[in-house]
Each structure stands twice: as C-alpha cells, then as structure tokens.
Amino acid sequence: MIKLKNINFKNISVVLLFFIAINYIFFTYRFFQRENGYILGDWLINYEGGFVRRGFFGETIVNIASILNLNLINLTFFITITIYLIFIFLLFKLIFSKKITFIIALIIFSPATLLFNFYDPLAIGRKEVLFFLFFIFYLFFSKKNFFMFCAPLLSMGITLTHELFTFLLPFFFVNRYLECDSFNLKKYKTEIIIALFSFITFLFII
C-alpha cells in the first residue's frame, strides 16, 4: 500500500496544473469564438454608452484593438489566456517554494477551487481570474517597493473591471495576520492601501 508521505505532491501538482491550463485555454477559445457570447461580452463591457460598472477592461481593450487595428475577439482571447497562464506559472512557483502536503494539495486542487473548471466549464473565462492573479502577485511581491506603487493602481483598475474585488479584500488581511500573528496596524500598510483605493473606487461606481 502506498503511503501518503511517499507521494510526491509537487510532481502531481505540476501534472494537474498542466491539464488545468489546457482545459482553460480550450474552453475559453470555444466560448470566445462561437459558443458563449455572454462570457466574451462581459469582458468587452465599455464606456461607449456612458460610464458603467465593469467597463474599464473593455474600454481599454477596445481602444487597443482600434488603435492597432487588431481583431477584438482574438485580442481579448490572447489577453485573458495570458492572464491565466501567468497566474498558473506563479502558482507553480509558489507550490515549489513551499512544502506541499496532502492537505494543501487537496485544498488547491479541490472541486471548489482550481478543479471547479472541470466540473463546470461555464466558469471558465470569467473576470474573477483578475483577483486571483492580483492576489498571487501580492503573495510574491507585497514586500517590494514597486508593489506599493503599483498596488493602488491595480486595485482601482480591477475594481472598475469587477466590483467583486472589493468584497474579497479580507483575504489580504487574513494572509497578513497568518504571517505576523498580530493586529499591529503598521504591519498592514500594504493591505490598508489596497483596501482604501478599492473601496473608494467601489463607492464611485455604485
């Protein structure tokens, strides 16, 4: 009988991440090209008819496509896939920088997290991936000086793209608490800045 402690969860994680990425690319392409106009349309909400919620990304990408004379659907597909692959790559690095136990692997690859896309392909290609990418950027770079400059701008941009970001802000504070095991506000400067800019932006769009 194979014991759990003898299983290399990092190698299993690499294989799973590979198939998750392939699955995401395949279904995103199908949805964007022919099968689900709603998912593509959500990314392309813009300010053509006036200021609306979730329009920042769409306004940006529509203008880029217009200026560079690019196919809007293909450009959107390329950018969303790039966002997801960067997330997968950083998650891969995070996994290999930590000791992966059975419990951690189970949490990462449970049907409620990354494997949810296999159970419900219609969840693929959603804007929520922006939160996951920003959060993993935060895990890697929150102690870097450049992140303190970029974080407010990114938090505002993501909130203007999907207001759900504001409701996920507690994850940043929970992570900091788990790191320092303290409620000293001086240690939460990055999290407070992210929350402040996101919340102000949220108040502006509601």
State where each predicted segment sits.
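Short hydrophobic/aromatic helix or loop-helix immediately within or flanking a transmembrane segment
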Residues: 48-82
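Membrane-lumen/periplasm interface segments of specific transmembrane helices
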Residues: 21-34, 55, 187-206
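Extracytoplasmic catalytic/substrate-binding loops of multi-pass membrane glycan-assembly enzymes
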Residues: 25-41, 48-60, 162
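Membrane-interface transmembrane helices that cradle and orient dolichyl/undecaprenyl
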Residues: 135-148, 182-183
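Membrane-interface alpha helices of multi-pass inner-membrane proteins
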Residues: 147-172
